[in-house]
Amino acid sequence: GQPVAVCLDWADVVRDGIVWDFFGAVTIVRRHLDTLEQQFGRRFSHAATSFPPGTDPRISINVLESAGLEVSHVLDEPTAVADLLQLDNAGVVDIGGGTTGIAIVKKGKVTYSADEATGGHHISLTLAGNRRISLEEAEQYKRGHGDEIWPAVKPVYEKMADIVARHIEGQGITDLWLAGGSCMQPGVAELFRKQFPALQVHLPQHSLFMTPLAIASSGRESGGAICKMNCRPRSFRRSIP
């Protein structure tokens, strides 16, 4: 049940939780399968995938099937994280590249979920406007200058926190878990702690990998799958340990 490899790519194939570059997404998945085959000496044939709440799961499924994979398990992203962490009376906030997923978990079950069209892409847009640079340059710049860009992007995260507040109001939760690559921006955890002083706010050390790990874990527990991977294509640099 331990993760043994990860494949990540920087690519603009998903916007606001929707795969807009289908061919590009399929190409990335096939390339990752080639890399894993070289590493492990076998071609993986099955995969688990996920989708943002409120979107069509067939989008992710179609990408995997077009890449030659059989889909063994499908669930929404906040539910995957909630199952992995075995939460109770907690909220999950998954700030991804294009959307922010919010889920409420009671006694291990997701009782409420929603998805808002704001995420890392909107951070990049704000940074591009602030520095008068291209969107691509902003994407590159924000990865290595977190502390420096915080004053410029903080208002966007404040808006995200306000959105989360509306969704969790009256839900009676005690903990709030942050997930997703955009949560790794320095200052985000402290901002959420100030916004929600009555809650215990948790930010895992590697929140970037929280959702893919949760999806892989859910696929493993469903049985029958050979390979589980987060195949909702996102924008990360490929790295194989």
Where does each model-flagged region fall?
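Short beta-strand scaffold segments in enzyme catalytic cores
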Residues: G1, T100-I104
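Nucleotide/phosphate-binding catalytic cleft detector across ATP-hydrolyzing
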Residues: G1-V92, K109-P241
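A generic beta-sheet turn/junction motif
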Residues: I95-G97
